[in-house]
Curated annotation (Swiss-Prot):
Organism: Human adenovirus A serotype 12 (HAdV-12)
Protein name: Core-capsid bridging protein
Subcellular location, record wording: Virion; Host nucleus, Host nucleolus
Family to which the UniProt record says this protein belongs: Belongs to the adenoviridae core-capsid bridging protein family.
Any one Pfam family match given in the protein's UniProt record, by short name: Adeno_PV
Length: 347
């Protein structure tokens, strides 16, 4: 330790030359630090055991927190693995001996590989998995055109959003689709080979009304007609209108009869208010003339024989005067209404 020795020499020389600067300080007070002895856990266990009066005869081995038994694998041969057994020969090359998990596997190993579960649940995966896009409308509002491509999602994101990626919330939302259509009367090869688009000509945009496909959900189709020119300079036919058929002028020799229309008689139903039911009145009620309704009369079930005077005394029925009625003409109809006497308190 030469460096340490030189340092000691320098300190001694400096203390001898300038003791007021390099001398030891006089007011060095040594602090009294109290060392706390850490109480061991064994002492607490011994104290608790002595307090409970339980004596442990044997010392137990330290237990693991998780009792891991390992991967339970059935002895099912892994698909594509060849096993060669030649009795009497020993494997000379130990590194060539395959491991147990390499030869045998679970019975659903192919399903695990397809679903990326079990021993295949490692590595990088897609953020969203395989998303299935379903077009909401496959109708063709232009019958003269035929679809060449399927409906593809229209990229409407900006360049910065494309770098960062699509947001997680935007995957479940609706996205616009695009589909290329060509005229039916032209061959697809002619359209693709002799197609020439002039960027100076603005395309014709036609916005169609919203088509309802589900409750609270609609699809709006926007037709963008791009004018296309051939190599010869002629404008190609984009959408052909149906050709009008000519009507042949001919003479009809058979006589023409007007069609006979069978008319059914219309049934007329009377007003419900004018229909009165058949009803039976109580014997104490005098029927009003002009209205339906009869007084209730008891049917004679057996021929009554004339007997002598009965002991029961019957009261004589008072002869009621006929009801006073009055005729009222209302809307050309004559109504027979009973005359009513009001209470003196009623005006």
């Amino acid at each position: 330790m030469p460096s340490m020795t030189k340092r000691k020499f320098k300190e001694e020389l400096l203390q001898a030359l300038a003791p007021e600067i390099y001398g030891p300080s006089d007011n060095l007070t040594k602090r009294d630090i109290k060392h706390v002895k850490k109480r061991e856990k064994k002492e607490e266990e011994v104290a608790a055991a002595s307090a409970d009066g339980v004596e442990f005869v044997r010392s137990f081995a330290p237990r693991r927190r998780v009792q891991w038994k390992g991967r339970q694998v059935k002895r099912i041969l892994r698909p594509g693995t060849t096993v060669v057994f030649s009795p009497g020969e020993r494997t000379i090359m130990r590194p060539l001996k395959r491991e147990y998990d390499e030869v045998y596997a679970d019975d659903d190993i192919l399903e695990q590989a397809a679903q990326q579960t079990g021993e295949f649940a490692y590595g990088k995966k897609g953020r969203y998995g395989d998303k299935i896009a379903i077009p909401l409308d496959e109708g063709n509002p232009t019958p003269s055109l035929k679809a060449v491509t399927l409906q593809q999602v229209l990229p409407v994101l900006g360049p910065s959003e494309e770098k960062r990626g699509i947001k997680r919330e935007a995957m479940d939302e609706l996205q616009p689709t695009m589909q290329l259509m060509v005229p039916k009367r032209q061959k697809l090869e002619d359209v693709l080979e002799h197609m020439k688009v002039d960027p100076s000509v603005q395309p014709d945009v036609k916005v169609r009304p919203i088509k309802k496909v589900a409750p609270g959900l609609g699809v709006q189709t926007v037709d963008i007609q791009i004018p296309v020119q051939t190599a010869l300079g002629e404008t190609m036919e984009i959408q052909t209108s149906p050709i009008k058929t000519t009507v042949n002028a001919s003479v009809q020799t058979d006589p023409w009869y007007p069609p006979v229309l069978s008319t059914k008689k219309k049934r007329h139903y009377r007003q419900t208010s004018s229909l009165l039911p058949d009803y039976v009145l109580h014997p104490s009620i005098v029927p009003t003339p002009g209205y339906r309704g009869t007084t209730f009369q008891r049917r004679a079930t057996a021929p009554s024989r004339r007997r002598g005077p009965s002991r029961r005394r019957r009261r004589r029925k008072a002869t009621l005067a006929p009801a006073a009625v009055r005729r009222v003409v209302q809307r050309g109809r004559t109504l027979i209404l009973p005359s009513v006497r009001y209470h003196p308190s009623i005006l």
